Amino acid sequence: MEAEEPPEARRRCPEALGKASGCCPEAPGKARGCCPEALGKLLPGLCFLCCLVTYALVGAALFSAVEGRPDPEAEENPELKKFLDKLCNILKCNLTVVEGSRKDLCEHLQQLKPQWFKAPEDWSFLSALFFCCTVFSTVGYGHMYPVTRLGKFLCMLYALFGIPLMFLVLTDIGDILAAILSRAYSRFQALLCLPRDISKWRPLLLCRKQTDSKPADEAIPQIVIDAGADELLDPQPSREPASPSCNVELFERLVAREKQNELQPPMRPVERSNSCPELVLGRLSCSILSNLDEVGQQVERLDIPLPVIALVIFAYISCAAAILPFWETDLGFEDAFYFCFVTLTTIGFGDIVLVHPHFFLFFSIYIIVGMEILFIAFKLMQNRLLHTYKTLMLFVCQREVSLPC
């Protein structure tokens, strides 16, 4: 017969099993409490991204409808007709005899305008979607642009709302990337057993964090009525017992303090409970609002060496440069690398034109993430340059002070 387990062992078994399996009796309540917070962190970014995708689809439908319809005036363009007539007159001459006609032909061909050959068929839905992505991402390659008057006004209005929305998405995604880069670099430091020193590049940020964390308790006035209340109000309390007149005066001062606090707008308390499902919506809204207030803070706190971020950028662009020539057969690795760099830095010269821009739409997420990585790199470089400039100015000022008059 098997030995019967003592009751203490039976009582400890569920706890031991719970710890061994990674859960405990309080885990369901904690999981329910963590779900609104996790959803509150993901929901703003997902909403921003969905708004940007919807905005791009609506813009593609508008531009394909405006620029894609046939224009009867474009078929009889007087400017194009005049250009062709002059070109025919130049070509009637014998170019081998008249050498000046060749120069006139070259100068005349330089006056050629690309919009003369823009066809409505070029503005399909996918082409218009590609154009919208180049507008609100501020890339603007230049080989695709609106020609009609209505299309130009629509493009300006579309950019006014699309560019801030794009920057908002970039800021939110930047926090995620900054958290990933910071954790990856911390694990890399732990693997190599490198010391984690406090960064010297962000002293102002640390001071700002300390000052921001101070007034949290000072902003909420508290009234404590106890035996030592007169000690709180009087900086030099007397050791003699309080008289009735002092008690009346103390009570009047407390009432005046309470009335003054009532004039301030009351702060709505946030109740937290894992057993009441009605409070889930309240916790979710509070989590969303708190995360919206912290948008962009993770990027400001990020501090990793510039060679690390430069290596990440090089690897990121190289991956796209190796994939892009599979459908853009005219591009080699060097041209594809150059095109991706010009795109991610929002320079957008327009010297390289994609033959199949529809396939490049699948790289929309790639473009957004790449632009954010470059933004983080530029932010880190800016902090380094500011630190170098401050160090140089301090050195110059100290040298001027040390010089004799």
From Swiss-Prot:
**Similarity field:** Belongs to the two pore domain potassium channel (TC 1.A.1.8) family.
Recorded hits in InterPro entries, A to Z, give: 2pore_dom_K_chnl (IPR003280), 2pore_dom_K_chnl_TASK (IPR003092), K_chnl_dom (IPR013099)
Give the sites modified to Phosphoserine: 275, 287
Per UniProt, what is one GO molecular function of this protein?
Answer: calcium-activated potassium channel activity
What is the topology of this protein in the membrane according to its UniProt annotation?
A: Multi-pass membrane protein
Intramembrane stretches, as ranges?
125-151, 337-351
**Keywords for this entry?**
Cell membrane, Disulfide bond, Glycoprotein, Ion channel, Ion transport, Membrane, Metal-binding, Phosphoprotein, Potassium, Potassium channel, Potassium transport, Transmembrane, Transmembrane helix, Transport
Q: What is its main location?
A: membrane
Sites binding K(+) 1 sit at 138-139
Lineage, uppermost ranks: Eukaryota, Metazoa, Chordata, Craniata, Vertebrata
According to its UniProt entry, what is the function of this protein? K(+) channel that conducts outward and inward rectifying currents at depolarized and hyperpolarized membrane potentials, respectively. The outward rectifying currents are voltage-dependent, coupled to K(+) electrochemical gradient across the membrane, whereas the inward currents can be induced in response to activation of Ca(2+)-mobilizing receptors. Homo- and heterodimerizes to form functional channels with distinct regulatory and gating properties.
Q: Where is this region: Interaction with calcineurin?
A: 221-226
- Record's keyword annotation contains Iron-sulfur: no
Q: How does it assemble?
A: Homodimer. Heterodimer with KCNK2. Heterodimer with KCNK10. Interacts with calcineurin. Interacts with YWHAH, in a phosphorylation-dependent manner.
Region of interest called Interaction with YWHAH, as start-end residue ranges on this chain: 272-277
At which positions is K(+) 2 bound? 139-140
UniProt name for this protein? Potassium channel subfamily K member 18
Carbohydrate-modified residues: 94
Subcellular localization, as worded in the UniProt entry: Cell membrane
